Every structure is written in C-alpha cells, then in structure tokens.
Amino acid sequence: MVGSAMLAECLRDPTITSVLVVGRTSVDVQDPKLREILHPDFLDFSSLAADFAGADACFFCLGVSSVGKNEADYRKVTKDITLAAAKVIVEVAPESVFVYISGMGTDSTEHGRLMWARVKGETENALLAMPFHAYAVRPGFIQAVGGVKTKTAWYAALYRATGWLYPVLRKVSPRSVIRSDELSRAMIEVARRRPAKRVLESDDLRELL
C-alpha cells in the first residue's frame, strides 16, 4: 500500500522528472517518467549499481507483517534486504537521501520484548549509521485514500473494520495516524529538505506539508 501511494505521488509531482521502481513483479503502471526493473534477488542489488548511480532519493517501501514469522525470517525481509539496497546506493549515490518506512513503536534500543520492534530498530540504527542522508519514518495507522489498497488480505479486512476510527484517532492521537497521500508527500519533503530530525513520527511528517 505504501509503495503504491509513494509511486502515485512521485508521478504526480511535477518537480520529480524520473522515477525508477525496482520490484519482483510489475506495478502495471504506464507513465513517461517511470522506468521499471524486475529484479529477482533482493539480497543482492549489485547488478543495479549503474541504475542507482546519481539518484537523488530512494523511498524504501518494502515491508512485511511479522504475523506468523519467526525472527530470522522477519529479519531477512525487514533488515537484510533493506541494507542490501542501502549498501549499493551509498556506494554509487552517497549524496542521496534514503527514506525508510519503519513503524510507530519501533524499538531503537534493540532490546525490547516485541520482536518486530527490535528488528525495525536494528534496521533504523544500521541505516542511520551509514554515510549518507538516511531517515526513518514511523507512521502508525495509515488511512488509504485515492484508490490505494493493501495487498495483504488481513490488513485490508482490518482497514475495512476500523476505518471509522480514523477521524477519532486523528483528533485524540494525531501522532498515531496519517493518510497515505500525506505520508507520501511528506516523504518527498524529507528528501527535499533533509531535516535535522532523522526519525519522524506521523505528526512530524504532517508538519512538513
């Protein structure tokens, strides 16, 4: 869902002249400024070094639910794949901005009881220690708008069941909610402005809009 919203916003933004999408399957979108690469091995992006060279920003939107996964499998997707991409980008585009989708509740100490929070904390810390402009954004509940939909069935069911809560949460706990279009626009603003704060919650992101 986040990746689809991010792509749509990048294609809409007139200041963004070229968009490269790397995935295992096609996004099935046609646009003059879009280029797509289907890449089977997400643990090795070295063959894409020339494609990444000179990039201004990377919006890393890959994510997976921890439900039903052991820690090793979750770490492979959440941390190992992220760092595999980041290591190539930092070599060929060291002045670029890397914006990583993390999540509210991430544990920066890496020692908490929640497995997913620890692993995301490890990932954030590793990225922030790398010699480029890395940011971690921590959205909570994301309201899908503009036709954006999640591909995860139980997420979709959850959104249908709890969508009515969004206006309430927005008032009582603005830090915990954000719309998909707001998140995407804010991530673009992070890349443009390079704010001093490098870990951003939903309310921090809305302040950039």
Residues covered by each model-derived region:
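N-terminal Rossmann/SDR dinucleotide-binding element
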Residues: M1-V64, L183
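Conserved short hydrophobic patches within well-ordered secondary structure
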Residues: L7, L11, I16-V21, I81, ...
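Conserved Rossmann-fold NAD(P)-dependent oxidoreductase catalytic core, especially the SDR/UDP-sugar
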Residues: V64, A72, K76-A117, G121-E122, ...
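Oxidoreductase cofactor-interface core, primarily capturing Rossmann-like NAD(P)-dependent enzymes
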Residues: R12-T15, P32, S108-L209
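Short, flexible active-site loop motifs that bind/organize anionic cofactors or intermediates
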Residues: M6, L38, A72, S173, ...
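Rossmann-fold NAD(P)-dependent oxidoreductase module
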Residues: A5, E9-D13, A84, V88, ...
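Active-site loop/turn elements of alpha/beta-hydrolase fold enzymes
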Residues: R24, G103, P139-I142
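NAD(P)H-binding glycine-rich loop region in Rossmannoid oxidoreductase-like domains
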Residues: R35-A84, V88-V90, D107, A191
